[in-house]
A protein has these predicted regions:
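Transmembrane beta-barrel strands of outer-membrane/channel proteins
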Residues: 26-30, 69-73, 97, 111-115
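Structural signature of outer-membrane beta-barrel domains
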Residues: 21, 31-35, 74-78, 116-120
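Outer-membrane beta-barrel "beta-signal"
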Residues: 99-101, 113, 135-148
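Residue-level signature of outer-membrane beta-barrel architecture
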Residues: 16-18, 59, 101, 146
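Extracellular loop and loop/strand-boundary signature of outer-membrane beta-barrel proteins
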Residues: 2, 39-44, 80-87, 126-132
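Repeated loop/turn-to-beta-strand initiation elements of outer-membrane beta-barrel proteins
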Residues: 21-26, 64-67, 101-111
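Residues that define the transmembrane beta-barrel architecture of outer-membrane proteins
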Residues: 6-10, 49-53, 91-95, 136-140
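Membrane-embedded beta-strands of outer-membrane beta-barrel proteins
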Residues: 12-14, 26, 55, 97, ...
Length: 148
């Protein structure tokens, strides 16, 4: 593949409506990170491009209320030479939950909570020294949809 600074993305998805009120989707994403041009060619250190698997579902509990939930697993193919104190990544899994509340014919309020748990990545510096890269992410969202 040619080198570019933004990786190409391959996506496949399938959705199914089990009932008129219950839907689910399964997705796979592959980012061609090893073919992207990064600073100091650090993409060459990756074991493979990024793999993501996602699953989600929506349930219309009532005419005015829809709830949803989802899961995402991300595997970056990390290696020690890819990680630095300035820029690092960690494999992760995420869980999200949300609700859409239909306020009027034209106005819907959306509320969501999203939590990402990152795997610790340990980079061996020497026989006695190591760096552990770690983080977590929790997001709360609130929004409105207006249909004209």
């Amino acid at each position: 593949l040619p080198i570019c600074d933004i990786p190409a993305l391959l996506t496949a998805a399938v959705g199914y409506e089990f009932l008129p009120t219950l839907r689910a989707t399964l997705e796979y994403h592959h980012f061609f990170d090893k073919a992207a041009g990064m600073a100091n060619d650090k993409q060459k250190a990756l074991k493979h491009g990024t793999h993501e698997i996602l699953i989600g579902a929506e349930w219309d509990i009532a005419k005015q209320l829809t709830i949803s939930g989802g899961y995402q697993r991300t595997d970056y193919g990390l290696a020690d030479d890819f990680q630095s104190d300035i820029s690092f990544s960690c494999d992760s899994y995420s869980l999200g939950f949300g609700a859409a509340i239909k306020m009027t014919k034209h106005l819907t309020m959306n509320i969501a909570y999203f939590w990402t748990n990152y795997d610790d990545y340990t980079k061996k510096i020497s026989e006695t020294t190591k760096n552990v890269y770690s983080r977590t992410n929790k997001v709360f969202g609130l929004g409105v949809d207006y249909k004209f």
